[in-house]
């Protein structure tokens, strides 16, 4: 045959012997593994040496045989993790974008909550009722600086009520209707507010001129103000209560004293309106209606001393026509006795 005549014909015997040897070796290895894995009880000592030998030889052989499978598993895990990581990356990016929105919202709510806490922390001495409101409109111009707040007459707000944010005085109410009120800012050209320097109690009028820093007019006293002095409301005239924070004094480029408003340090979005009318509401009504003095009892005008005075008794003066002779004076008693007459006179 051509196969036998060819160069491969000489490989028949080696291939047969190789197959036979491989079969025998496999059988021996199989028997050795069976013996090594056998759970011996009574014959444990008989196969102890064989088991130890098989374990010693099987360890590197098992490692070499298991290496390709292990490498294949690692490769599959890598490919699987690559595609899983790509999918997970896309999912995490979408989640991160969503969480950024929640983060921005949480920061906004935290800022709003802090401002609400600051507004709730506003206290006046003596206490004055307040109404919280949100500024819904901003009207700015070269001459007018006003805001609209979403609280009106239904909440007891009237014209002239002071308006504050969490930092200080903002302005006062100049117009009110149901559900809305107009607030005139301190920077408006029509704004006039009596203030005083907290350090010296020097009085002045805070006058708006349309700029960010209103000026101090009619400042009285000797050296009444210094750079950085705290300016508060004076309460003069009963327009606003005394002691509300306004700002800090600074000297402008024109040489005039001005005020850096505390209210400008925070946005004017949420405000509190003081329901302040006049100083009469600051006093205790019970003290104003204190017990008065007991009433004075008076007599009847007909019998009063003032209307019918009683005359003192006066001795009557006799008239010449009705005059009567006065009685003779009584005889004085004799001091010596007279002898009795016994005979005729001589």
From Swiss-Prot:
Record field: compositional bias (Polar residues): 299-308
Keyword Coiled coil: yes
InterPro entries referenced in this protein's UniProt entry, alphabetically: Cell/Rod_1 (IPR042177), Cell/Rod_MreC_2 (IPR042175), MreC (IPR007221), MreC_beta-barrel_core (IPR055342)
Main location: periplasm
Protein location: Periplasm
Cellular component terms (Gene Ontology): periplasmic space; plasma membrane
Coiled coil stretches, renumbered: 89-118
One Pfam family matching this protein: MreC
Gene3D superfamilies the record matches: Rod shape-determining protein MreC, domain 1, Rod shape-determining protein MreC, domain 2
Compositionally biased tracts (Low complexity): 309-340
Keywords: Cell shape, Coiled coil, Periplasm
Chain segments carrying region Disordered: 292-346
Effect of gene knockout: Affects the localization of MltA, MipA and PBP2. In the case of MltA and MipA no polar localization is observed, and in that of PBP2 the banded localization pattern is lost. Depletion of both MreC and RodA results in defects in stalk growth and mutant cells expand relative to wild-type cells. They appear to arrest in expansion along the long axis of the cell.
GO biological process: Gram-negative-bacterium-type cell wall biogenesis; regulation of cell shape
Subunit composition and interactions: Interacts with penicillin-binding proteins (PBP2, PBP1a, PBP1b, PBP2a and PBP2b). Interacts with outer membrane proteins belonging to the TonB-dependent receptor family of transport proteins.
Free-text function comment from the UniProt entry: Involved in formation and maintenance of cell shape. Required for the spatial organization of components of the peptidoglycan-synthesizing holoenzyme in the periplasm and peptidoglycan synthetic activity.
Protein family according to the UniProt entry: Belongs to the MreC family.
Protein's name according to its UniProt entry: Cell shape-determining protein MreC
